């Protein structure tokens, strides 16, 4: 039976967030609603989740010794990774020493590396994926591209938000694509994955919850990507009953193999009734921000319930809903937002993340909308996002 202590007291239930961006902020808020003591950690000060946490720390989370020292000092009941740039080998060590990593250290280690999760899905579980090859040198990269054929995509095995990814259509692009992949890798270079292009009708994120009362699914979320990042997402994404059944089976198999309780963002390609696995994140997903308006329990509330060992029961979806990112481009450490009065149309909401600065393009907020149809919800959310004026 779960017992939650009182925050800031000796018996407090403590959650340490490793990563304190906009997704971590919502997880922190859900923890606060249950009286949980929140410790927010990131590589920079005043990150969004730090603004709603009891305490915060700035460290290099890729430094295993620094991470270990902080965990030992704070003694959290739950360590909740919210980003991928973490010393995952140290998380494994900490888990072996008795610390609770969400959903588990092995899931975090496997999913931060495209090679780990691809081999688990395709080779261990036999899940359909794109054709692929791995390469750790420019020569082997050329061989991998030759084996896959054109067009193909190259990605660092360790990167996020589209960093280091290129679409290759001809041999003339190989040298530039290799250099870009090496620059975009999280560890400053290394192995890459070369993937064949997948013919698909649409992409979905299937939010899958592994909880004490079993596996649960949210309604499929459709989304549009640009430059490796999502721009709009919507729920529900219409798909055939057979495709949805296959998607749920695939997501369930992957999530169970990864292990641990929590919410997982499973990314899939859908073509007719066929479903192909893409990636999975063992944490709330950026495209899932639409659930802040589309469901009775957001993806963040579901994640917290699951890792605490609480039952999920059923998830109610309210109908056609969408999100659109607020993505200004400027340079400032004193960002201001205006025109909110005119931006807020009926049945819409805005979330401003409170990021302390911006250099170039940065996701600073999200617009949420509900409507009669998903197409209408998308257009309304885009209109709201575009109406928010951001200046420095």
UniProtKB/Swiss-Prot annotation:
Its EC number is 6.3.1.21. Gene3D superfamilies: 3.40.50.20, ATP-grasp fold, A domain, ATP-grasp fold, B domain. GO terms for cellular component: cytosol. Pfam families: ATP-grasp, PurT_C, RS_preATP-grasp-like. It comes from the Bacteria. It catalyses: N(1)-(5-phospho-beta-D-ribosyl)glycinamide + formate + ATP = N(2)-formyl-N(1)-(5-phospho-beta-D-ribosyl)glycinamide + ADP + phosphate + H(+). The keyword Repeat does not apply. GO terms for molecular function: ATP binding; magnesium ion binding; phosphoribosylglycinamide formyltransferase 2 activity; phosphoribosylglycinamide formyltransferase activity. It is an enzyme of class 6 (ligase). ATP binds at residues 114, 155, 160-165, 195-198, 203. Residues 119-308 form the ATP-grasp domain. Keywords: ATP-binding, Ligase, Magnesium, Metal-binding, Nucleotide-binding, Purine biosynthesis. One of its GO terms (biological process) is 'de novo' IMP biosynthetic process. Mg(2+) binds at residues 267, 279. N(1)-(5-phospho-beta-D-ribosyl)glycinamide binds at residues 22-23, 82, 286, 355, 362-363. InterPro entries: ATP-grasp, ATP-grasp_carboxylate-amine, ATP_grasp_subdomain_1, PreATP-grasp_dom_sf, PurT, PurT/PurK_preATP-grasp, PurT_C, Rudment_hybrid_motif. Pathway: Purine metabolism; IMP biosynthesis via de novo pathway; N(2)-formyl-N(1)-(5-phospho-D-ribosyl)glycinamide from N(1)-(5-phospho-D-ribosyl)glycinamide (formate route): step 1/1. PROSITE patterns: ATP_GRASP (PS50975). Homodimer. Belongs to the PurK/PurT family. Involved in the de novo purine biosynthesis. Catalyzes the transfer of formate to 5-phospho-ribosyl-glycinamide (GAR), producing 5-phospho-ribosyl-N-formylglycinamide (FGAR). Formate is provided by PurU via hydrolysis of 10-formyl-tetrahydrofolate. This is Formate-dependent phosphoribosylglycinamide formyltransferase. It comes from Pectobacterium atrosepticum (strain SCRI 1043 / ATCC BAA-672) (Erwinia carotovora subsp. atroseptica). The gene is purT.
């Amino acid at each position: 039976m779960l017992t939650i202590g009182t925050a800031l007291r000796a018996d407090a239930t403590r959650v340490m967030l490793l990563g304190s961006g906009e997704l971590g902020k919502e997880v922190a808020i859900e923890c606060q609603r249950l009286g949980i003591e929140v410790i927010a950690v990131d590589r920079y000060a005043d990150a969004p989740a730090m603004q709603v946490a009891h305490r915060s720390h700035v460290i290099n989370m890729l430094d295993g010794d620094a991470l270990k020292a902080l965990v030992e000092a704070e003694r959290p009941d739950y360590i909740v990774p919210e980003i991928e740039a973490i010393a995952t080998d140290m998380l494994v060590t900490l888990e072996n020493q008795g610390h609770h990593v969400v959903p588990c250290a092995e899931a975090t280690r496997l999913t931060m590396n495209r090679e780990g999760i691809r081999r688990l899905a395709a080779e261990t579980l036999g899940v359909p994926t794109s054709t692929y090859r791995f390469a750790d040198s420019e020569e082997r990269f050329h061989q991998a591209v030759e084996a896959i054929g054109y067009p193909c995509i190259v990605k660092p095995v360790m990167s996020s938000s589209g960093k280091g990814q290129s679409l290759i259509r001809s041999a003339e692009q190989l040298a530039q694509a290799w250099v870009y992949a090496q620059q975009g890798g999280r560890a400053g270079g290394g192995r890459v994955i070369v993937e064949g292009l997948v013919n698909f009708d649409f992409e979905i994120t299937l939010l899958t919850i592994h909880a004490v009362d079993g596996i649960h699914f949210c309604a499929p979320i459709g989304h549009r990507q640009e430059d490796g990042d999502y721009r709009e997402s919507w729920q529900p994404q219409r798909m055939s009953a057979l495709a949805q059944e296959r998607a749920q089976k695939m997501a369930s198999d992957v999530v169970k193999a990864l292990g641990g309780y929590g919410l997982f963002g499973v990314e899939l390609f859908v073509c007719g009734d066929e479903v192909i696995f893409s990636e999975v994140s063992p944490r709330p997903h950026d495209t899932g921000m639409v659930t802040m308006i589309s469901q009775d329990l957001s993806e963040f509330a579901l994640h917290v319930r699951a890792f605490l060992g609480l039952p999920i029961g059923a998830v109610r979806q309210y109908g056609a809903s969408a999100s659109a990112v607020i993505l200004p481009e400027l340079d400032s450490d004193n960002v201001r937002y205006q025109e909110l009065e005119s931006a807020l149309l009926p049945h819409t909401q805005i979330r401003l993340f409170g990021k302390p600065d911006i250099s170039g393009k940065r996701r600073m907020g999200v617009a949420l909308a509900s409507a009669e149809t998903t197409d209408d919800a998308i257009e309304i959310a885009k209109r709201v996002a575009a109406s928010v004026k951001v200046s420095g």
